[in-house]
């Protein structure tokens, strides 16, 4: 895949439930601590190395940000690092929280 794909929160949720992809959240630490998708990995400059060590490059990665804009740049970056399939989640955490309020976790 040369280009990331945009995906809506319903499709992202389904991929997560079926263990077809991993979810990363690129928001700042304070926003992440105030609420994030329960299965999200907090991807920062400091955690990128650990994420890349622990996740195979052929595992699809879904990127979540605030509203679905910043995730596009991060998705492109992950493709450039060698990940085969990367998605940017349209609507970001705001849409996720609205659609799946029971699947929001709190804390770091």
From Swiss-Prot:
Subcellular location: Cytoplasm
Pfam family, one: Rhodanese
Domain Rhodanese residues, every copy: 17-105
CDD domains: GlpE_ST (cd01444)
InterPro entries recorded: GlpE_sulfurtransferase, Rhodanese-like_dom, Rhodanese-like_dom_sf, Thiosulf_sulfurTrfase
Active site: 65 (cysteine persulfide intermediate)
GO molecular function (one): thiosulfate-cyanide sulfurtransferase activity
UniProt catalytic activity: thiosulfate + hydrogen cyanide = thiocyanate + sulfite + 2 H(+); thiosulfate + [thioredoxin]-dithiol = [thioredoxin]-disulfide + hydrogen sulfide + sulfite + 2 H(+)
Domain of life of the organism encoding this protein: Bacteria
Biological process per Gene Ontology, one example term: glycerol metabolic process
Family: Belongs to the GlpE family.
The protein's name in its UniProt record: Thiosulfate sulfurtransferase GlpE
Lineage: Bacteria, Pseudomonadati, Pseudomonadota, Gammaproteobacteria, Enterobacterales
